[in-house]
Amino acid sequence: MALDILIVDDEQDIRDLVSGVLDDEGYGTRTAASADEALAALDERLPSLILLDVWLRGSSMDGIELLRAIKLRDPQIPVIVFSGHGNIDTAVAAIGHG
């Protein structure tokens, strides 16, 4: 069975690109444009892996806050946090939350 990967990013182009590449490699993907959509996807089915953008513009919480919420639901879900606008403080915060 293929890994189920949840891609969380506010930019449609990024979601489409990452999802397309992973789908072509045989992975199952779902996407979410906001923290609320991501949490709803978790309620539906826990993924094998989450790819999470740090900056979720227009969302009820940013990526670090969403990471905390994800880890409260299931601390075992692996999460890869990414951003085109990161800095050391953001990286330290992400590592600190799992």
Each model region followed by its residue ranges:
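Short, conserved "switch-loop" micro-motifs in signal-transduction and mechanochemical regulators
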Residues: 73, 85-86, 97
